[in-house]
Structures are given as structure tokens and as C-alpha cells.
């Protein structure tokens, strides 16, 4: 038992023999198109791009699922259900994937001008809804009262939940706890200036900008906004049951919109079948002696997604089970 490694500089191979076992800790396969097509076809079908583009010294993507394939060749079984982590972080996203207003639960309309969901959703469920829409796109819409509304939004991954009152990059945020969860007038106006957001003095002007040459969608959007305003003022969303605490009438200009598209793939949660001792298993569910896993290659950690409300859950599990794998390999457990 052991491994072969190749020296990229010389091309020479190195053979390493081990006596206590092998620990596979090689990450996921989010840059391997063939594996994505097999295990997570929706990533390919929806043209989801991978957030991480790390490469090795030869320019090859590092997250190719090599360790999973090595384990399979040794007889290890792969977790059957996989969960691609595609956490939507809002429309008009910057290079870090963070949107103009994050995934805050403001009104959202499809390309026909219709409201189609309860907007108060976590990032993964929000992504699922966007993928069901025409062209996998929609419009987030809000008015000038957004600074007063942000504190009522959840502190979600990629969300916006507090307001910073600064109007220039030089001035900067006053409470720089995290760059992801605050929004400022400077950020919003910068997004308008570079085209990531749309601004208008009236709702009629706004819908004309976001639905150009489609008068039917413009009228449907105005009707949808009027309906949403009525529900917000009534304090009950009988259409999609969004909490009243996060519904506000969209009626005070200027008005803003930013386009939601598909989000970025963070990681594919689905590796080799494993347990709390980091073992791997063959087709008959027998432990494969001496073969352990830790990190994203370790399957059976999450069923559908990891809970983003539990901060650091993925990294902490990778660190902890790396320790467990090392300890068990040393003791031949």
C-alpha cells in the first residue's frame, strides 16, 4: 500500500510505501466535466461556473476528483446522492460572487414580470428557484427605503442585513465586520454606474428599462408590484406566504433593480462512502483496511447541502476528520 508521485520539474516518479494506511484528502471534482455530468448533471445543464479555478504548477485544475477515482479503483464506493453547493448571493454579482443587494428578500419578478416565489429563502433554495425560470434569470426590485429595511433581513451567507452610511470608496465602512453583509449608497450607485443595477425615478421608467420592447411584461410587472404592495400593506402574503416582517411596499423612488442569474458552484458534496472513523467501504459495505478519507472527498457528511447557518461547518469537519483519519490510521483502527 502506498502511492506514486511525479516530480513536475523533472518528470521522475517517486514511489512511497506505507505501513499504516493511506488517507485520501484531495477535495472534490467541481472542475471535472465528466464527473459533473454523471453525479451532478444540473451543474452542466444550467451552465453553472465553478468559483474556484485553482491550478497546479502545470496549469491543470486541482479539483478534478483524482482522489475519488483512486478510491474507486481500490474498490471504494461513492456516495449515491451528491449535493452541489450553489448558494445564490444576489444579482449583479461582483468577482467574489456577492450581489448588489445580496440575496436579501426583496421583491423578485421573472422575465414576464410575474412574481414567482417567497423571496425569503436561503441561498441554495433561491438558486433552485432561479434555475426554474426562463433563461434562468429574474429581477430583484426595491425602492429608496432599502436602508431602513436591511436590518430586518437575515444574516445569511451572501445576504445583506445592515446599512453602512458612506458615499465614497475613500470614506469606507465604519463597522467593517464583514464585507459581505453590509450595503452602502456608494456600493449601490457604483453598481448603477457600471451597469450591474438599474435605477429610475418612477416604476414605469424602471420596468421600461428592465423589459425593453416588451410592453406586456412591463404591464405585468406593474400589476405584480401593485399586488405585492397591497399584500405588504395588508400584512399577509396570501400568494407565497412570505413573513410580513420582510414585506414592504415598493412605492418610494428612486427605484432599483438588479438581474439574478445562476450562481457559482462552491463545491460538490459527495465523495467516497465513509463513517465517523473515516473508513471507506466496498460494494458489500465491508471496511477497506488501510484506506481513509477526510475533507470534501469524505462522503456521507451532508445529504442535500451543508447548513450555512452553522458557520465553518465544512472546514471544521474537514479539520476534525483529518485528525480522526490520522489517528485511526496510526492505530490501525
Question: Language-model features: where?
Answer:
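An anion/pyrophosphate-binding glycine-rich loop and adjacent beta-alpha core
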Residues: 68, 74-209
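Short, small/polar residue-rich loop motifs at catalytic or cofactor-binding pockets
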Residues: 101-103, 266-268, 311
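Conserved redox-cofactor binding core of oxidoreductases
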Residues: 1-12, 19, 33-34, 231-252
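A glycine-rich dinucleotide-binding beta-alpha-beta segment and adjacent secondary-structure elements
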Residues: 202, 213-305
Amino acid at each position: 500500500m502506498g502511492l506514486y508521485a511525479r516530480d513536475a520539474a523533472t518528470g521522475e516518479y517517486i514511489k512511497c510505501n506505507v505501513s499504516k494506511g493511506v488517507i485520501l484528502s484531495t477535495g472534490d471534482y467541481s472542475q471535472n466535466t465528466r464527473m459533473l455530468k454523471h453525479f451532478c448533471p444540473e451543474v452542466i445543464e444550467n451552465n453553472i461556473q465553478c468559483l474556484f479555478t485553482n491550478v497546479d504548477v502545470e496549469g491543470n485544475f486541482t479539483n478534478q476528483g483524482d482522489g475519488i477515482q483512486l478510491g474507486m479503483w481500490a474498490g471504494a464506493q461513492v456516495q449515491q446522492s451528491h449535493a452541489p453547493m450553489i448558494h445564490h448571493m444576489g444579482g449583479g454579482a461582483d468577482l467574489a460572487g456577492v450581489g448588489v443587494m445580496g440575496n436579501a428578500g426583496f421583491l423578485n419578478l421573472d422575465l414576464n414580470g410575474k412574481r414567482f416565489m417567497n423571496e425569503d429563502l436561503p441561498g441554495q433554495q433561491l438558486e433552485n428557484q432561479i434555475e426554474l425560470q426562463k433563461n434562468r434569470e429574474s429581477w430583484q426590485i426595491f425602492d429608496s427605503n432599502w436602508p431602513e429595511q436591511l436590518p430586518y433581513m437575515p444574516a445569511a451567507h451572501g445576504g445583506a442585513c445592515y446599512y453602512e452610511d458612506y458615499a465614497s470608496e475613500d470614506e469606507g465602512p465604519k463597522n467593517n465586520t464583514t464585507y459581505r453583509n453590509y450595503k452602502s449608497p456608494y456600493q449601490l450607485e457604483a453598481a448603477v454606474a457600471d451597469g450591474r443595477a438599474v435605477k429610475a425615478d418612477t416604476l414605469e421608467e424602471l420596468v421600461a428599462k428592465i423589459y425593453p420592447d416588451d410592453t406586456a411584461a412591463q404591464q405585468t410587472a406593474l400589476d405584480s408590484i401593485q399586488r405585492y404592495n397591497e399584500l405588504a400593506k395588508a400584512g399577509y402574503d396570501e400568494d407565497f406566504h412570505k413573513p410580513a416582517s420582510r414585506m414592504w411596499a415598493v412605492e418610494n423612488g428612486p427605484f432599483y433593480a438588479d438581474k439574478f442569474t445562476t450562481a457559482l458552484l462552491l463545491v460538490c458534496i459527495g465523495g467516497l462512502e465513509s463513517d465517523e472513523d473515516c473508513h471507506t467501504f466496498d460494494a458489500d459495505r465491508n471496511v477497506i483496511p488501510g484506506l481513509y478519507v477526510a475533507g470534501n472527498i469524505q462522503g456521507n457528511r451532508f445529504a442535500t447541502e451543508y447548513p450555512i447557518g452553522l458557520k465553518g461547518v465544512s472546514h471544521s469537519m474537514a479539520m476534525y476528520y483529518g485528525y480522526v483519519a490520522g489517528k485511526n490510521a496510526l492505530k490501525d483502527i
